[in-house]
């Protein structure tokens, strides 16, 4: 039985979330907190398997509450937020930085066209994220210092030939992406393209949070746009995003892959097909196997491939599936991925 603590200052929202979850035979709501202070007490007293966290609450907001819980009694936390308020979305990603695993939209009212999809997404998130092993966050948590050059030997042909870096991520991805790009130099000589599995409505907030927290330029990809070096592009909601041979974005509304659109598989496959050996593919932490076979295609077509290592992954599903296929040339933690990219940048300039 999955034991859930609900945190929200709205009695109506608490009632709605409880009514959704109590229909599930494997889920039990063991408590409700109306503010952050109650949440901290109940998290310690009840030891839930997972907490759903609101952001805008009196006295102690969701960001501060998440931070204190992760410092004292670490437990999987998902942020359940509205998607109509950009400031609330931005605050949601600050909570991710403090240790929350993911951000999801609050289910709309019954009868709304998106109700069934949102409810299914919420319930699946409870089941999925309750299994993630989390660690205690230090109160004096600091950003990782700028990494030195990687000790990994990068073949000369690789650092001369790469034209684009494509990245796929799911569970734990935002934190890892933040760590990687915060350690890239200004004027990084290559474009980066990211597919991040995320609840609809939060991609713009993700891009804003990454830009503000790292100083690295991040934007939402646009169809036909020419990729520029030194910039991270994030695939938009609901659209498969690919790259062409002349480094432009191509979009598609073809059926979802792995029940996902955009999918990592679509991005990686387009890069392997259109750019061959000129691609660096990186597959980060996440559930399932999205992108694993296509990472192998990048490697088979002469590109360079990296998977996040098991120890640093929140969930080793996607990189683990790639490892089983021998798709990754390198298996690295985030700090080493950043070092690899810095070395790639520095050696290209020699």
From Swiss-Prot:
GO terms for molecular function: phosphorelay response regulator activity; protein-glutamate methylesterase activity; protein-glutamine glutaminase activity. InterPro entries: CheB-like (IPR008248), CheB_C (IPR035909), CheY-like_superfamily (IPR011006), Sig_transdc_resp-reg_Me-estase (IPR000673), Sig_transdc_resp-reg_receiver (IPR001789). It catalyses: [protein]-L-glutamate 5-O-methyl ester + H2O = L-glutamyl-[protein] + methanol + H(+); L-glutaminyl-[protein] + H2O = L-glutamyl-[protein] + NH4(+). It is found in: Cytoplasm. The keyword Phosphoprotein applies. Keywords: Chemotaxis, Cytoplasm, Hydrolase, Phosphoprotein. Phosphorylated by CheA. Phosphorylation of the N-terminal regulatory domain activates the methylesterase activity. GO terms for biological process: chemotaxis. GO terms for cellular component: cytoplasm. Residues 3-121 form the Response regulatory domain. The modification 4-aspartylphosphate is found at residue 54. It comes from the Archaea. The active site is at residues 170, 197, 290. Residues 158-322 form the CheB-type methylesterase domain. Its EC number is 3.1.1.61, 3.5.1.44. NCBIfam families: PRK00742.1. Belongs to the CheB family. Involved in chemotaxis. Part of a chemotaxis signal transduction system that modulates chemotaxis in response to various stimuli. Catalyzes the demethylation of specific methylglutamate residues introduced into the chemoreceptors (methyl-accepting chemotaxis proteins or MCP) by CheR. Also mediates the irreversible deamidation of specific glutamine residues to glutamic acid. Contains a C-terminal catalytic domain, and an N-terminal region which modulates catalytic activity. This is Protein-glutamate methylesterase/protein-glutamine glutaminase 2. It comes from Methanospirillum hungatei JF-1 (strain ATCC 27890 / DSM 864 / NBRC 100397 / JF-1). The gene is cheB2.
């Amino acid at each position: 039985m999955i034991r859930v603590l609900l945190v929200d200052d709205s009695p109506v929202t608490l009632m709605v979330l409880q009514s959704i979850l109590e229909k599930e035979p494997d889920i039990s709501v063991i408590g409700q907190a109306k503010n952050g202070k109650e949440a901290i007490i109940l998290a310690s007293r009840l030891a839930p398997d997972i907490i759903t966290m609101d952001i805008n609450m009196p006295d102690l907001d969701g960001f501060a509450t998440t931070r204190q819980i992760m410092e004292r009694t670490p437990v999987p936390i998902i942020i359940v937020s509205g998607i109509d308020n950009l400031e609330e979305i931005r605050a949601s990603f600050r909570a991710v930085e403090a240790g929350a695993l993911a951000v999801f939209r609050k289910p709309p009212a019954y009868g709304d066209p998106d109700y069934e999809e949102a409810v299914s997404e919420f319930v699946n998130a409870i089941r999925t994220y309750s299994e993630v092993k989390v660690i205690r966050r230090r109160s004096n948590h600091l950003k990782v210092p700028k990494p030195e050059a990687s000790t990994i030997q990068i073949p000369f042909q690789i650092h001369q030939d790469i034209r684009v870096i494509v990245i796929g991520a799911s569970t734990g991805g935002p934190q890892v992406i933040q760590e990687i790009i915060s350690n890239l130099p200004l004027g990084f000589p290559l474009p980066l393209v990211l597919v991040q599995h995320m609840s609809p409505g939060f991609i713009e907030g993700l891009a804003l949070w990454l830009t503000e927290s790292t100083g690295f330029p991040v934007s939402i990809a646009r169809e036909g746009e020419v990729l520029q070096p030194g910039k991270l592009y994030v695939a938009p909601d609901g659209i498969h995003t690919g790259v062409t041979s002349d480094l432009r974005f191509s979009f598609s509304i073809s059926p979802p892959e792995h029940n996902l659109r955009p999918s990592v598989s679509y991005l990686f496959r387009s890069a392997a097909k259109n750019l061959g050996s000129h691609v660096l593919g990186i597959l980060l932490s996440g559930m399932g196997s999205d992108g694993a076979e296509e990472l192998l295609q990048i490697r088979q077509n002469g590109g360079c491939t990296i998977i996040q290592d098991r120890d640093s992954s929140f969930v080793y599903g996607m990189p683990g599936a790639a490892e089983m296929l021998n798709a990754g040339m390198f298996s690295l933690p985030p700090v080493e991925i950043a070092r690899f990219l810095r070395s790639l940048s520095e050696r290209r300039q020699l």
